Amino acid sequence: MYIILWRYKVDPAQEAKFVKAYGPKGEWARFFSAAKEYLGTELLADDERPGEYLTIDRWESEEAYSGFLGEHESDYDRLDRRFEALTLSETRVGAYGIAGAKG
């Protein structure tokens, strides 16, 4: 499994729209679901810092994720620009695999 984590600081006036767009049934998840190797998205709200969220995007493999992005780069960029105004900041925390899964 391959997991990508993103951290967001959300504009308070846009929070409901953000949750709808970035949640497990939101537009990002629907976009990624075109790939059979996409396993799902979780949206976590920070209990200690209001307006801060994490997304966890799960894929079968790094290759599946990279391949999807390569094939759909312009659509990804268009969707990213569309939702840019919902956040005050967006940080890619990292990409992770299951420990011990390789070799």
What spans do the regions from the language model cover?
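Short, well-ordered beta-strand segments in beta-rich or mixed alpha/beta enzyme
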Residues: 2-9, 40-71
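Short amphipathic
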Residues: 7, 95-97
